[in-house]
C-alpha cells in the first residue's frame, strides 16, 4: 500500500519558479515541493547566463524585474551568505543603421530605468576596446544591470522554504494525478501525496503535468539556447566589461570567472528533454561575436545548453486554470525566470492563496490580469 503524505499545497517542480513561489507560500500554508530530478534546478535554472536587466523583455517582464530588485538588493536576514547581485552593467550596441532604434528604446525605457543612457562610439571603444568601430557606433547602456548568483538565490529560496516549515522531495517520478473530493492525489509509485491546491511549476514539462491532471494545456514551447565559455584576449583586462549584446539580440558576451561567456541568443524549438548544445549553435555564436569584435575564439573551454519555455505571447503565466480554482500555473518563464523570480514568486503565492498583492508589487504595476492564463484563449 502507498504511503500517503498530506499538505495544503503541492508544488510540482523545484526550479526557480517552483522554489520561489513555495518560499513565499510557506509562512501561510503547509507546502510540499515535488521534483523529478535528483537535484533541483537541473534543466533551466542551473544553466542560466544570470543577468539582471530592467531593459530585457516585454513590458510585463520589465515590471516584474523592477519589482524583484528590492528583494535581491535587500534579501531577508539569513537568506543568502553573500550578495545576490554584483555590479556588471549592460550595453546593447548598434551600427549607424540602428541609431533611430536605440533612441526609441531609450525614450521608451528611460523613465523607469535609472541611469539608462545612450552612449557613442568613443565610449564603447574605451569601455570594450575589442569592439569593431563599424559595429559599435551607438549603444544603450544600463549601469544598474547586474550579475546574479543563481545558485545562491535558488538555494536561498529552498533553505527558506524548509526554515518556514515547507518540504522538498526529490527523485519523485509522478505516475498519475487525480482529483478527488476537495483534494488532488499525486501518485509517485510507492508514495501518494494529497493537497487541496496544486501548483504546476514544471518548466518545459508543464503541459505534460497538466495532461496528467486532465487540465487544458497552455501550449508551452520549450526552446534551446546554447552557450560557451572561452579565453579572454591576452593582455586585456576584461573583468569590468559590461554584458554586451546587440540591439537585434543576435548574440551576447560577458565576463565570467576569468573567462568570457558567449551565446548566439538562439531560441530553437525542441521537445522537453535534457537538452545539449548543438555544434552549429556554438559556431554561429563564435562567428557573430568575431564579426563585431577583434577577438579570435579558437576553442571554447566549455559548452552547454538550457531550455527556455514560452507561450504564444512570450509573457509569463501565473494564475488558475480556466474553470479550475485548485490548479495554478507558474509557467512560461522564458529567459526571464531568474531575474523576475522574487516578484513572480511573491505574486503567484498571493494569488494562489487568495491574498491581496502587497503594495510594492502593485506600485510596480503588477496585476493578476497580466499573468492570467485566460489571456491565451483570446
How does the language model describe each region?
Residues 3-7, 323-378:
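C-terminal lid/capping helical subdomain adjacent to the catalytic/cofactor pocket in oxidative enzymes
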Residues 4-7, 188-197:
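Core beta-strand elements of the Rossmann-like FAD/NAD(P) dinucleotide-binding domain
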Residues 26-45:
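Glycine-rich FAD pyrophosphate-binding loop
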Residues 41, 192-240:
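Central helical "cap/lid" subdomain
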Residues 216-219, 232-326, 331:
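Active-site lid/adjacent beta-loop-alpha segment flanking the redox-cofactor pocket in flavoenzymes
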Amino acid at each position: 500500500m502507498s504511503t500517503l503524505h498530506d499538505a495544503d499545497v503541492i508544488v510540482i517542480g523545484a526550479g526557480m519558479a517552483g522554489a520561489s513561489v513555495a518560499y513565499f507560500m510557506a509562512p501561510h500554508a503547509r507546502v510540499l515541493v515535488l521534483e523529478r530530478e535528483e537535484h533541483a534546478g537541473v534543466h533551466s535554472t542551473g544553466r542560466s547566463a544570470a543577468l539582471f536587466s530592467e531593459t530585457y523583455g516585454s513590458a510585463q517582464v520589465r515590471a516584474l524585474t523592477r519589482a524583484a530588485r528590492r528583494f535581491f538588493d535587500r534579501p531577508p536576514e539569513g537568506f543568502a551568505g553573500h550578495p545576490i547581485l554584483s555590479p556588471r552593467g549592460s550595453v546593447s550596441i548598434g551600427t549607424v543603421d540602428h541609431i533611430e532604434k536605440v533612441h526609441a528604446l531609450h525614450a521608451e525605457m528611460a523613465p523607469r530605468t535609472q541611469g539608462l543612457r545612450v552612449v557613442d562610439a568613443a565610449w564603447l571603444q574605451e569601455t570594450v576596446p575589442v569592439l569593431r568601430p563599424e559595429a559599435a557606433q551607438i549603444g544603450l547602456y544600463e549601469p544598474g544591470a547586474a550579475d546574479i548568483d543563481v545558485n545562491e538565490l535558488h538555494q536561498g529560496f529552498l533553505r527558506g522554504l524548509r526554515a518556514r516549515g515547507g518540504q522538498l522531495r526529490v527523485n519523485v517520478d509522478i505516475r498519475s494525478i487525480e482529483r478527488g473530493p476537495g483534494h488532488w492525489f499525486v501518485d509517485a509509485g510507492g508514495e501518494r501525496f494529497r493537497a487541496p491546491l496544486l501548483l504546476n511549476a514544471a518548466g518545459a514539462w508543464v503541459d505534460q503535468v497538466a495532461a496528467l491532471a486532465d487540465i487544458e494545456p497552455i501550449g508551452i514551447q520549450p526552446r534551446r539556447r546554447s552557450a560557451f565559455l572561452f579565453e579572454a584576449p591576452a593582455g586585456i583586462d576584461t573583468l569590468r566589461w559590461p554584458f554586451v549584446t546587440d540591439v537585434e539580440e543576435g548574440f551576447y558576451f560577458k565576463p565570467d570567472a576569468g573567462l568570457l561567456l558567449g551565446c548566439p541568443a538562439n531560441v530553437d524549438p525542441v521537445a522537453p528533454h535534457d537538452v545539449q548544445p548543438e555544434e552549429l549553435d556554438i559556431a554561429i555564436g563564435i562567428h557573430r561575436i568575431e564579426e563585431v569584435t577583434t577577438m579570435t575564439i579558437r576553442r571554447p573551454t566549455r559548452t552547454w545548453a538550457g531550455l527556455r519555455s514560452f507561450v504564444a505571447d512570450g509573457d509569463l503565466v501565473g494564475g488558475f486554470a480556466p474553470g479550475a480554482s485548485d490548479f495554478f500555473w507558474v509557467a512560461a518563464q522564458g529567459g526571464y525566470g531568474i531575474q523576475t523570480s522574487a516578484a513572480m514568486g511573491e505574486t503567484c503565492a498571493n494569488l494562489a492563496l487568495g491574498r491581496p498583492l502587497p503594495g510594492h508589487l502593485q506600485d510596480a504595476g503588477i496585476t493578476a490580469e497580466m499573468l492570467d492564463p485566460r489571456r491565451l484563449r483570446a
